[in-house]
Amino acid sequence: MNKRMNELVALLNRYATEYYTSDNPSVSDSEYDRLYRELVELETAYPEQVLADSPTHRVGGKVLDGFEKYSHQYPLYSLQDAFSREELDAFDARVRKEVAHPTYICELKIDGLSISLTYEKGILVAGVTRGDGSIGENITENLKRVKDIPLTLPEELDITVRGECYMPRASFDQVNQARQENGEPEFANPRNAAAGTLRQLDTAVVAKRNLATFLYQEASPSTRDSQEKGLKYLEQLGFVVNPKRILAENIDEIWNFIQEVGQERENLPYDIDGVVIKVNDLASQEELGFTVKAPKWAVAYKFPAEEKEAQLLSVDWTVGRTGVVTPTANLTPVQLAGTTVSRATLHNVDYIAEKDIRKDDTVIVYKAGDIIPAVLRVVESKRVSEEKLDIPTNCPSCNSDLLHFEDEVALRCINPRCPAQIMEGLIHFASRDAMNITGLGPSIVEKLFAANLVKDVADIYRLQEEDFLLLEGVKEKSAAKLYQAIQASKENSAEKLLFGLGIRHVGSKASQLLLQYFHSIENLYQADSEEVASIESLGGVIAKSLQTYFAAEGSEILLRELKETGVNLDYKGQTVVADAALSGLTVVLTGKLERLKRSEAKSKLESLGAKVTGSVSKKTDLVVVGADAGSKLQKAQELGIQVRDEAWLESL
């Protein structure tokens, strides 16, 4: 029976690839169904012989307990946005300072959810959400139910690929019709529907909703030398790659493509929100490098946002964790980009003055970056009042005088004991990208603060399980889970804590770079600003901000209290060892290694202080080669770069 099951699995997987990937089926639906039923019968009779890549895994129901955290071996960066031709020209100018004659590749920006797929020996072992770029959620079982994701590859590869998982418009209409018939709330748009589907604990629901994917990148070190060749290779492996793309030599060609896509946008069977422009040559990408948050070799052009008219009813002023006071407009409700909008940001007092926004004005509302509702401008022809908005002079939280510094556009409260700032700081500290304390959201933090149970972040770690039972609406089970989540967060790697402290200009990426270099927050506390500023991708602004924070009264006490409560202050990831054998060197791995897995070789190089990259360029210091090294070895020899073999690496 095992032989026949092998035959059926191979046949059905081939037919599925023809149908979903190539759009060129070689058998009828009825023949596919007949073979599928035969396989189901055999697997029912011989469950111990079910194969890992059987297509029946895609439809079976499985109720999951939840989603585990998963550390990305290759971090996912954000893309810099562009909203105009001028911003694209500026991007091109920056690229041409480093690369003489760049060729660009333009791809559609799918409005879906970023995913990372890892295969070992050609078998799908992990499907993960983007998360914060470093840590995502393991949703492998759900992604196995997405029919166009290969469970196995035609080669026994160790490879990680990236793409977008989305819901086609036709599937979205079907899902919403079913929800309407069942009396369930409809999804606002296909992206929300895809996100909700991938968060399902019942995998049978995922299988029914017909999600789809477009893959766009090999995240693990590639043997291809361009993005275009990489996309073609992904197609050869059986992944679905969006065919709508071009190579361009200049911004004129890119702009023409953007205009063409914009005209076709509404007729596509899926949602897009822009065009991604990348430098095509991977060695040039390597040469350009990254900022703290984004690659310098790519930009995402975003289409102009949908705009609607609404009437301004009133303005709320709220204080953020850094003391900035932000105005928010209350509006007559309007439908915008698939959701009902009744509140929109007014940004700051300078923006209100610049746009001359007045009481009861009719305003144009849009979603900035297709996400945040914002007031764009006033419809002056519909103005009914000349009365200006009331601008506060005192903090709406603590009543302290508000300041408007000359070099800032916002009002600011500088009272360090301002309740709103403290509470917002606590919410930030517990958030997913910071200490990731599950369940400790804004409502619980507000109740803890109101009950005088927490005044700073160290107090969170002094809480006992019974303290939560003092809060309205919190039962024993919830209290136990909250306490356990707080205890678990003590073990986080220290970059999560550093970001959680809310130091101005120190984001999650900068926190990771700092801890990779200094190894612990205590070492960072002792460091001078010149050493911080010398770290690649950081600079003087972050160094000055850290110096100001650590010099402030109470910072040393807070760190000591956190340590005393058991919070980890050390970095648990791969550190940069200043005096290691390969410290500061840029190394490329290429070819087939005989004894080490590629991931093992990469980890060893990084432990020796090297930065491992995927392409050979003039910035490369060393190339480690295995069998069939190919074009990367040739390029290294042409550039006079030092070449070593696997035996040399093992000897270190």
Curated annotation (Swiss-Prot):
Catalytic residues of the enzyme: 109 (n6-amp-lysine intermediate)
Binding site residues for Zn(2+): 395, 398, 413, 418
Molecular function as annotated in GO: DNA binding; DNA ligase (NAD+) activity; metal ion binding
EC number, UniProt record: 6.5.1.2
Record flagged with keyword Zinc: yes
InterPro entries given in the database record: BRCT_dom, BRCT_dom_sf, DisA/LigA_HHH, DNA_ligase, DNA_ligase_AS, DNA_ligase_CS, DNAligase_adenylation, DNAligase_N
Binding site for NAD(+): 29-33, 78-79, 107, 130, 164, 278, 302
Any Pfam family matching the protein: HHH_2
Cellular component, GO annotation: cytosol
Required co-factors: Mg(2+); Mn(2+)
Keyword list, A-Z: DNA damage, DNA repair, DNA replication, Ligase, Magnesium, Manganese, Metal-binding, NAD, Zinc
Boundaries of every BRCT domain copy: 577-652
Catalytic activity: NAD(+) + (deoxyribonucleotide)n-3'-hydroxyl + 5'-phospho-(deoxyribonucleotide)m = (deoxyribonucleotide)n+m + AMP + beta-nicotinamide D-nucleotide
GO biological process: DNA repair; DNA replication
Xref: Gene3D superfamilies: 5' to 3' exonuclease, C-terminal subdomain, 6.20.10.30, BRCT domain, DNA ligase/mRNA capping enzyme, Helix hairpin bin, Nucleic acid-binding proteins
Record family assignment: Belongs to the NAD-dependent DNA ligase family. LigA subfamily.
Function according to Swiss-Prot or TrEMBL: DNA ligase that catalyzes the formation of phosphodiester linkages between 5'-phosphoryl and 3'-hydroxyl groups in double-stranded DNA using NAD as a coenzyme and as the energy source for the reaction. It is essential for DNA replication and repair of damaged DNA.
UniProt-recorded name of the protein: DNA ligase
Species of origin: Streptococcus pneumoniae serotype 2 (strain D39 / NCTC 7466)
